[in-house]
């Protein structure tokens, strides 16, 4: 069962709305600020309903012939990264900025990150600390077999598909790049948790692919939470070099070290930077 509801973001107070103040004696003019829609999809792959927060660009008309790129955002709940990433997309697509094409943003609301974003680990400590982890294969199947077909059928989409993932979401985006690169044209991988399973993903073969833009951003993050010491900045750099060394045709790889950012602050700046690199 798939349903759509209005996604409402209420302005903090009437006094903040466009800088205006209510006129004495008149009722408040405050009203909801519509940011997008909340959609719901029943997933057979995950055996559960999943919430999708959808941003549709200004001028979007389902009866029109214009089709839009789609940006798929992991950790896409309203209280996660959806609102500030949508702000970046909207701002950069304003006519007077014209940095990014008008795009649809699909925020995949999080249910259980460790379950959905990680593959099985052989590290005993990780298994004990995260007993439900290791089912990224099901989540990738959900994206491939259910989510993307649903979005393509319901919305006016082009063939351009971007994925954005940070931390464990960056690990998942990297796994998709390794195993199912055809699912996306552009990969925005931020502070990926490549330490998972003692960095085993970095040792796996990387499928050959063409026509990709890949951004890998990392801040000053230091040691990963592993028994065997791993540095997140080093792992991210190793990933970038591994992709570059394939010398695939028409593949652009951008490694971006942001020393003023940490694991908590990097997401917004990294996505902003990726847009500048993808759309010079």
Question: Which residues are covered by each model-predicted region?
Answer:
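Bacterial Sec-dependent N-terminal signal peptides
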Residues: 1-25
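A domain-start/cap signature at the N-terminus of enzymes
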Residues: 19-68
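Active-site machinery of serine-nucleophile hydrolases
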Residues: 77-140
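Active-site nucleophile loop of the alpha/beta-hydrolase fold
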Residues: 110, 188-196, 219-222
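Conserved acidic catalytic loop of the alpha/beta-hydrolase fold
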Residues: 142-159
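Alpha/beta-hydrolase fold nucleophile elbow
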Residues: 155-166, 187
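Gly/Ala-rich beta-loop-alpha elbow adjacent to hydrolase catalytic centers
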Residues: 165-169, 173
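C-terminal catalytic histidine-bearing segment of alpha/beta-hydrolase fold enzymes
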Residues: 217, 222, 233, 237-280
């Amino acid at each position: 069962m798939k349903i759509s509801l209005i996604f409402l973001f209420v302005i903090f107070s009437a006094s903040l709305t466009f800088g205006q103040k209510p006129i004495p004696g008149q009722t408040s003019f405050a009203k909801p600020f519509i940011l997008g829609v909340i959609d719901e999809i029943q997933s057979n792959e995950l055996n559960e309903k999943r919430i999708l927060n959808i941003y549709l660009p200004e001028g979007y008309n389902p009866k029109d012939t214009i089709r839009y790129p789609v940006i798929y955002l992991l950790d896409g709940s309203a209280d996660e990264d959806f609102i500030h990433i949508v702000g970046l997309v909207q701002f950069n697509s304003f006519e007077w900025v014209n940095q990014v094409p008008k795009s649809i943003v699909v925020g995949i609301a999080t249910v259980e990150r460790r379950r959905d974003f990680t593959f099985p680990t052989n590290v005993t400590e990780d298994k004990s600390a995260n007993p439900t982890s290791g089912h990224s294969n099901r989540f990738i199947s959900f994206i491939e077999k259910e989510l993307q077909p649903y979005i393509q059928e319901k919305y006016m989409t082009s063939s351009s598909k971007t994925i954005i993932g940070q931390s464990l979401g960056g690990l998942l985006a990297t796994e998709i790049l390794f195993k199912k690169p055809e699912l996306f044209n552009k990969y925005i991988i931020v502070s990926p948790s490549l330490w998972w399973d003692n960095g085993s993903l970095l040792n796996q073969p990387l499928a050959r692919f063409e026509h990709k833009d890949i951004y890998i951003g990392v801040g000053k993050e230091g040691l990963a939470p592993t028994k065997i010491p791993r540095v997140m900045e080093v792992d991210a750099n190793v990933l970038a070099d591994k992709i570059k060394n394939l010398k695939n045709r028409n593949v652009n790889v951008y490694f971006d070290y942001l020393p003023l950012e940490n694991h908590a602050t990097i997401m917004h700046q990294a996505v902003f930077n990726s847009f500048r690199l993808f759309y010079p």
